Amino acid sequence: MASVTFSVPKGFTEFSGLRSSSASLPFGKKLSSDEFVSIVSFQTSAMGSSGGYRKGVTEAKLKVAINGFGRIGRNFLRCWHGRKDSPLDIIAINDTGGVKQASHLLKYDSTLGIFDADVKPSGETAISVDGKIIQVVSNRNPSLLPWKELGIDIVIEGTGVFVDREGAGKHIEAGAKKVIITAPGKGDIPTYVVGVNADAYSHDEPIISNASCTTNCLAPFVKVLDQKFGIIKGTMTTTHSYTGDQRLLDASHRDLRRARAAALNIVPTSTGAAKAVALVLPNLKGKLNGIALRVPTPNVSVVDLVVQVSKKTFAEEVNAAFRDSAEKELKGILDVCDEPLVSVDFRCSDFSTTIDSSLTMVMGDDMVKVIAWYDNEWGYSQRVVDLADIVANNWK
C-alpha cells in the first residue's frame, strides 16, 4: 500500500498541495493512504470521549458545491484533490470572479505555490482540474443557485457571510441537502471539531459549522489538558497571520484596529475561539477567554494558552500527555514538535495543532503554558474535508 507524508514540504515550490511529496519535517508522521483518505477512517471510534459512531457505507459519491472560492474554498479543493477514494465529488463552484479568475487563482497561489494539477478554463462556464469538469456559477443570492438542478448534496459555505440559519438555509432552499459552514456559526447551529466532538455528529442537522481555524487548533490540546489535569480557568492569545478581513493600507473598517495597514502593524483584535471551545467541550463553558494579535505574515498562526489546573504537574508530564494522545485518539489531528522551528516550517501542515514541546512551561505546579502552531488555511481545510467525509459516511 502506498504511503503519504502527513507533514509539511519544505521548499517553497513544493507548497502546492502535492499528493506525493517525500520531503517532511523532523516531526512528520507517515500514514497509510487509507489513513490519509480521511480522519474519519484513521480511527473513527477513537474520536471524542464516548467511543464514537461507526463509519457508514457510501455507495455513490456525494455531489459537493463550494460557495465562495476564496482562501478556504481553494484550499479545500486542493485538499480534496489530494485524497484518494474520497466519498465526495466536487461538481460546482459559486464565485463572483468568474471562470478565468477561478482557474488562475487555483493554479497559482502566493502561499501554496503552483498547484500540481492541470487546471484550465473549460469553456465559459466551467474549469477543468486534471480533466475533471467543475461548473462555475455566479450569484450572490444562495437561494437562486442551481443546487436542485445539479443534485447537490453538500454545500461548503466558504464566504464567511452566510453563517446563520437564515443565510446558510438559503442553500437548502435552493435544493442542497446539507451545508457545512467554514467559520463559526451563529445562533444554535451545531459546531463540530474533528477529533474533539465529531463523534456526536447528527445527520438530522441540515446545517453545521466546522468552527474557526483557531478553535480547531485550541480544542484538541485543551481537551487533553482538561482530561489529564483538569482546567480551572485560562486565557489564550493567538498570534495570527493577517486575513482578507483586514486592510492592506489604512482604510475604513468597522474595527478601528483592523482598519490599519495589515502588513505594517501588529493588530490586536477580538477572537471568539477560546469561548467557542465550550461549544465542543461544554464542561469548559466560562473557563476560557482570549484575544488575537494579527501580525504581518500571510499564513500560519500560533496559540499561546495559559491555564490553571487542578492536578499538580510539571512540563515533561504535560508533554507526555500530548505525545500519548498524538499516537492514539488524536492521531493525525495533534502533533508534538521537538525541533526549534519557526512559522514558515508549519506551512501546509495537515495537523490541526502542533505542540512546541520546548516551550511548554509549568509555573509552581498548577499553572501550565502551552504553545501550539497551526496552518490556519491548509490545516483547517483538511478538517473541512474530514467533516464532509463524516457527513458522507453517515449519509441516510
From Swiss-Prot:
GO biological processes: glucose metabolic process; protein homotetramerization; reductive pentose-phosphate cycle; response to cold; response to light stimulus; response to sucrose
The keyword Chloroplast is annotated on this UniProt entry: yes
Keywords: Calvin cycle, Chloroplast, Membrane, NADP, Oxidoreductase, Plastid, Transit peptide
Recorded topology in the membrane: Peripheral membrane protein
Listed SMART domains: Gp_dh_N (SM00846)
Listed EC numbers: 1.2.1.13
Record InterPro entries: GlycerAld/Erythrose_P_DH (IPR020831), GlycerAld_3-P_DH_AS (IPR020830), GlycerAld_3-P_DH_cat (IPR020829), GlycerAld_3-P_DH_NAD(P)-bd (IPR020828), Glyceraldehyde-3-P_DH_1 (IPR006424), NAD(P)-bd_dom_sf (IPR036291)
GO function terms (MF aspect): disordered domain specific binding; glyceraldehyde-3-phosphate dehydrogenase (NAD+) (phosphorylating) activity; glyceraldehyde-3-phosphate dehydrogenase (NADP+) (phosphorylating) activity; identical protein binding; mRNA binding; NAD binding; NADP binding; protein homodimerization activity
Residues that coordinate or bind D-glyceraldehyde 3-phosphate: S212, C213, T214, T243, R258, T271, G272, R294
Induction info: Repressed by darkness and sucrose.
Record-linked Pfam families: Gp_dh_C, Gp_dh_N
Transit peptide region: 1-60
Active-site residues (renumbered): C213
Family classification: Belongs to the glyceraldehyde-3-phosphate dehydrogenase family.
PANTHER family registered for this protein in UniProt: GLYCERALDEHYDE-3-PHOSPHATE DEHYDROGENASE 2
Protein name (database record): Glyceraldehyde-3-phosphate dehydrogenase GAPA1, chloroplastic
Organism: Arabidopsis thaliana
